[in-house]
A protein has these predicted regions:
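Active-site proximal loop and beta-alpha junction motif in alpha/beta enzyme cores
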Residues: 1-244
């Protein structure tokens, strides 16, 4: 069994929720293209990050079916875990900073995968949306408080299989901040929080809370003890790690 960590990215103020990402710190343990795809698929998580050079911050991001040149939550999770000042991705160099309870990165909107940003009249309308049919990746959003830059959002990947809705997504929030040219505080899913703000030279800052619990290599899901996610602010939710 290969060691890996699970992080929750874009946690809410209580330390709960967030997007679950797997991080393999020793990327040399999974080098083959098909092996990485299979590992990411078996994880059952949004994405898996393989750290190919921890000193330089070189990472490789995989979803269940493809390589991702850049993705917000995986980059934030890996940066927080490695305490890295920057990450090197296929899309480019991602600047990183830690600011108290939040981890921030700077990225170019052009790096983000395409998303359909669909505005609705109210948060209640967003909350009442059914899952759209398979097709385009839809980021549904509405103003909670336009003056304060507060947004309510949900993310629908549009896949015919797998996740119908993601708890939190950084790339779509980054694209929305770029479109609106302003800082945003977004509540997504059941209670995740995503922060964005325009930055220098056309970059956009993306920030959120990251919580960690480390997996135990070699134990199966049937025998591995439950683990507790989060920092002292967390709500002590318990999960079982996946058997990879």
């Amino acid at each position: 069994m290969i060691g890996y960590d699970i992080v929750r990215v874009f946690c809410g103020p209580d330390g709960d929720h967030g997007d679950r990402i797997a991080v393999v710190r020793d990327g040399s343990a999974v080098t083959g293209e098909q092996d990485r795809v299979a590992f990411a698929r078996r994880s059952g998580l949004t994405a898996t990050v393989f750290v190919d050079d921890p000193e330089r911050g070189v990472i490789d991001i995989r979803s269940a079916d493809r390589r991702l040149p850049f993705a917000g939550a995986p980059c934030l999770g890996a940066a927080w875990l490695l305490d890295a000042p920057e990450l090197i991705t296929p899309a480019g160099v991602v600047g990183v900073r830690l600011d108290g309870e939040f981890t921030w990165l700077e990225a170019r909107p052009a790096w983000a995968p395409p998303r359909t940003l669909r505005q609705y009249d109210s948060p209640e309308e967003v909350d009442a949306l059914p899952v759209p049919p398979p097709g385009e990746w839809v980021y549904a959003w509405a103003w909670e408080d336009e003056g304060a830059g507060r947004v309510r959002a949900r993310g629908f990947p549009g896949r015919g299989h797998g996740a119908e809705e993601v708890e939190a997504t950084g790339s779509a929030a980054l694209l929305l901040a770029d479109r609106l040219h302003r800082a945003l505080n977004t509540s997504q899913g059941r209670g995740s929080q995503v922060l964005t703000a325009p930055a220098r030279d056309g970059l956009v800052e993306l920030g959120g809370r990251v919580h960690l619990d480390r997996a135990v290599p070699g134990a199966s899901a049937a025998t591995r003890p439950a683990i507790t996610l989060g920092s002292p602010a967390s709500s002590r939710r318990r999960i079982h790690l996946l058997d990879l």
